[in-house]
Amino acid sequence: MPSFDIQSELNKHEVSNAVDQANREVATRFDFKGSGATYKYEGNSITLQAETDFQLKQMIDILQNKFAKRQIDVAHMKLEDPIIQHKSAQQTVMLLEGIDQTAAKKIIKLIKDQKLKVQAAIQGEKVRVTGKKRDDLQSVIGLLKEQEIGLPLQFDNFRD
């Protein structure tokens, strides 16, 4: 039976490259000269450090542009509240990866509401969809691309 997986994954190498490019741009921009503004990429988070809140907002914009140039969906980014002190401002950007249980249940409910002859099952941080016809699977992909789920989804592991 044909099947495919729905997942939400990040290419960590591309994220690292985007952060490096953003660091280079901040180091060479005139309005950031001598400010000590930096990005630090650790695990599933990126920490932004600058002198003012305004610089943090500019740094977020730079990071989003670098993500877009590297074909990384900016929906993977979840901005935490900034921590602003006397001469420094810091903000953490969490990188969302994988489909959590609530999002997986929402995806399965959307698929079942269409009354297509497919089965969807949660497998860890992925959702596997199986069906008898390839056309049904393609209509599920079209449906999920139209819906606003709040996560960037990738469709892979197609099998016949």
From Swiss-Prot:
Keywords: Nucleotide-binding. HAMAP family: YajQ. The keyword Ribonucleoprotein does not apply. Belongs to the YajQ family. This is Nucleotide-binding protein CBU_0114. One of its GO terms (molecular function) is nucleotide binding. GO terms for cellular component: cytosol. The keyword Transcription regulation does not apply. It comes from Coxiella burnetii (strain RSA 493 / Nine Mile phase I). Nucleotide-binding protein. InterPro entries: DUF520, UPF0234-like_C, UPF0234_N, YajQ-like_sf.
